[in-house]
């Protein structure tokens, strides 16, 4: 079972296909922006907007703060209330809508940004009413409304993870609390002992979700001297 299959097994919602999701998003975009954009003109940007909504939900961001009335990246100087992850999401969203090529969407970016919170909220409500979702929405719903009675296995084994999204970390916490999860982490002590950014996250995960495998030798491959033999052609 993949992590995606696990989430889907714990939710009554179904992940809809991309075309359905973008077409539904277009309705809410048109309603709140009063734009005369056609679906053809919107579709590419709709996929981008959907991708950003997906990232926001998988990182469990506060959409009202992230989609506040912010018209310029320089306003970051005064948004100390945002977490680093939220600032990163916001920065990426601005960059995605930046560029040399002009389009009605880009020219009206400021007005679009100021209604994104309404689009996001209304869109998700409409999807939920149809019993469907995009992947990040479903993941977030499972993480925020975890119900252990929906678990179908006695134990879940998570192997090979090294960087978690917020929704994954929340699910791991819930399963660990129910004593229904064991973990096999993918890491090397080289990253742990050299102030590497990857090591920082793994250290936190190992503390929260102890590794099932003991022993240090299997986690020190990058610190050993390699013996490489070159074969001639």
Regions found by a protein language model. Give the residues of each.
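Nucleic acid-machinery interaction/catalytic patches
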Residues: 1-233
């Amino acid at each position: 079972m993949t992590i995606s299959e696990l989430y889907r097994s714990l939710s009554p919602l179904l992940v809809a296909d991309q075309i359905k999701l973008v077409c539904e998003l277009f309705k809410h975009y048109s309603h709140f922006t009063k734009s005369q954009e056609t679906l053809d003109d919107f579709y590419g940007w709709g996929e981008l907007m959907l991708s950003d909504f997906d990232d926001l939900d998988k990182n469990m961001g506060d959409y009202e703060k992230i989609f506040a009335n912010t018209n310029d990246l320089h306003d970051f100087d005064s948004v100390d209330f945002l977490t680093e992850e939220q600032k990163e999401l916001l920065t990426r969203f601005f960059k995605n809508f930046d560029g040399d090529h002009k389009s009605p969407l880009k020219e009206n970016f400021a007005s679009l940004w100021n209604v994104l919170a309404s689009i996001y909220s209304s869109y998700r409500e409409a999807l939920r009413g149809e019993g469907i979702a995009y992947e990040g929405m479903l993941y977030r719903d499972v993480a925020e409304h975890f119900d252990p009675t929906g678990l179908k296995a006695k134990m879940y084994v998570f192997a090979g993870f090294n960087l978690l999204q917020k929704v994954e970390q929340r699910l791991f916490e819930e399963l660990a609390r129910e004593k229904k999860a064991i973990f096999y982490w993918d890491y090397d002590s080289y990253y742990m002992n050299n102030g590497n950014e990857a090591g920082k996250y793994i250290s936190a995960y190992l503390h929260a979700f102890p590794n099932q495998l003991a022993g240090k030798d299997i986690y020190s491959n990058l610190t050993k001297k390699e013996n490489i033999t070159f074969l001639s052609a």
